[in-house]
């Protein structure tokens, strides 16, 4: 799930954004 997180901005809260 870290790959998509980088697109969001590399925060690491991909689960929180889950866009």
Curated annotation (Swiss-Prot):
Keyword RNA-binding in record: yes
UniProt KW keywords: Ribonucleoprotein, Ribosomal protein, RNA-binding, rRNA-binding
Cellular component, GO annotation: ribonucleoprotein complex; ribosome
Cystines in this chain: none
Superkingdom of source: Bacteria
Ranges in a coiled coil: none
GO MF term list: rRNA binding
Family of the protein in this entry: Belongs to the universal ribosomal protein uS19 family.
Biological role stated in the UniProt entry: Protein S19 forms a complex with S13 that binds strongly to the 16S ribosomal RNA.
Name of the featured protein: Small ribosomal subunit protein uS19
Organism: Spiroplasma citri
């Amino acid at each position: 799930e870290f790959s998509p997180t980088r697109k969001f901005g590399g925060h690491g809260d991909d689960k929180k954004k889950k866009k």
